Amino acid sequence: MLKSYQAGVREYRETYWDPHYTPKDSDILAVFKVIPQAGVPREEAAAAVCAESSTATWTTVWTDLLTDLDYYKGRAYAIEDVPGDDEAFYAFVAYPMGLFEEGSIVNVFTSLVGNVFGFKAVRALRLEDVRFPLWFVTTCDGPPHGIQVERDKLDKYGRPMLGCTIKPKLGLSAKNYGRAVYECLRGGLDFTKDDENVNSQPFMRWRDRFEFCQEAIEKAEQETGERKGHYLNVTAPNMEEIYRRAEFAKEIGSPIIMSDYLTIGWAAHSSLSRWCRANGMLLHVHRAMHGVIDRNPRHGINFRVLAKLLRLLGGDHLHSGTVVGKLEGDRAATLGWVDLMRERHVKEDRSRGLFFDQPWGHMAPVMPVASGGIHVWHMPALLAIFGDDAVFQFGGGTLGHPWGNAAGAAANRVALEACVRARNEGRDVEREGKDILTAAAQSSPELKVAMETWREIKFEFDVVDKLDAPHR
C-alpha cells in the first residue's frame, strides 16, 4: 500500500469536529437539536451526527485511502446551548456540495435524516433548519406555477382566496358531495377541497366525485361570473394511478388537483409536480402526517424544513397552520414558515426560528393555506397574519352555518371583503376586528348569524412545539 493504514475505532470528534471551519457558500448547512446519551461529550455527539449523516461508518476502513476524505466529509463546526433545556444543544453541520445529487431532495434527506436518527450515541435528535445554497436551489424544479400565475389563471387579485374542505370528509355519496361543492362556490368561495383521506373509497369512487365536482364548478361559475375550482385529490396507491386521475381531472377542465406529499413520497410528489407544470394544472399540497414528524420539540424534523423542501419539490399551495385555529402553530414560527414559502430571500432571524439565510433565486413562491378550526371571528387576525397571498380555508366554519352551506360561504366572503376594505383604508384590522365585522353584519344576515353561532368558540390550548424561550 502506498499509504499507511491504521485500523480500529477512533472517536468521531478526531475527524468530524472542526470548530475552526468557516462554512462555504456552496455548503448545505444543517442545525440539529441533539440530546446525547449520558456520558457522551457534546463535541463527540455532534461529530457522531455529522459523521453518520455524511461519510463515516463505525470503524476506520482501508478504502478511506482511495478517496479524498477531507474533501467529502461533513464538518460539525459549532455548538450552542438550547435556551431553557439543560439536556439538549444545537449542533451546526456543514456538508460539501460534492456529497449530493443535484436537484435530489430524496438524496439530501436520506443522508441528513437517515440512519443517524437511530444512532445509539444520541437519545433524541431533531433537524431544526437547513440552508440550501443557491446552486442546489437552482437544480430543483420548484412550484409548477406560483402565486402570480395562479392569480392570472383565476383572475383574482387584491385579497386572499377563500376555500372550504367538504365535510363530513368521509361517507358522502358523489352526488351529495357535488351538491355541497356547488352551494359553497355559489355562496362566494373561490375553492372547495377534498380532504386528505378522500381517495376512491366504496362510498364515493374517484371518477364519480371528479365528475360531480366539475359539474358543480361549471354551474357556480355560470351563476357568479367568477372562476372557481375544487382541489381534486389524486392521491392513489401507485404513481400510474395518480397520473390516470390527474389526466382525467385535466380532461374534464379542472384548474387544480391536490396530493398528500408526505404520504405519497417525495419522489412521487416531485413527478406529479412536473406533470402539473407541463399540463398547466395548479397543485394544492396537503401535509397529512406532518405532526408525526414535526410536533415533538425534541425529535423529528421541524416544519420549517418540511416547508422548504416542499418549495423545492414543487407545489402551488401548502397548508401552513393558522395560529388562531385548532391546529398546532406558534405565531412567530408560522410567520417564519410563511416567509420561507413566499419570499425570494429570507434572512436569519432567531426570533422566528430561522437559523440561516435562505436564498431562493427566481424560484416561484408557494401560497400558504390557513386551515383548521377557523371561522368568521378569525378573519381579522388571519388577514393581519398572512396578508393577501394566502388561502383561508373554512370547513366547519362554512358548512356549519345554521342556514346551510351557501350562507356559510356568503358570511365568509362578506367578512373577508369587509376586513380587506378596512385594511386598505388604513385601519388596524386585528385590533378593530370586532367593530369591522359587527358593522359588516348590519347588511349581511348570513354574517350576523355566523358571528352569533361561533361567538364563544376558541381553541386556547398551549402550543407544544414552541420556539426555544429566549428566541421568542
UniProtKB/Swiss-Prot annotation:
Coiled coil: none annotated. Substrate binds at N115, T165, K169, R287, H319, S371. Mg(2+) binds at K193, D195, E196. NCBIfam families: PRK04208.1 (NF003252). RuBisCO catalyzes two reactions: the carboxylation of D-ribulose 1,5-bisphosphate, the primary event in carbon dioxide fixation, as well as the oxidative fragmentation of the pentose substrate. Both reactions occur simultaneously and in competition at the same active site. Binds 1 Mg(2+) ion per subunit. This is Ribulose bisphosphate carboxylase large chain 1. InterPro entries: RuBisCO, RuBisCo_large_chain_AS, RuBisCO_lsu_C, RuBisCO_lsu_C_sf, RuBisCO_lsu_fd_N, RuBisCO_lsu_N_sf, RuBisCO_lsuI. Its cofactor is Mg(2+). The active site is at K167, H286.
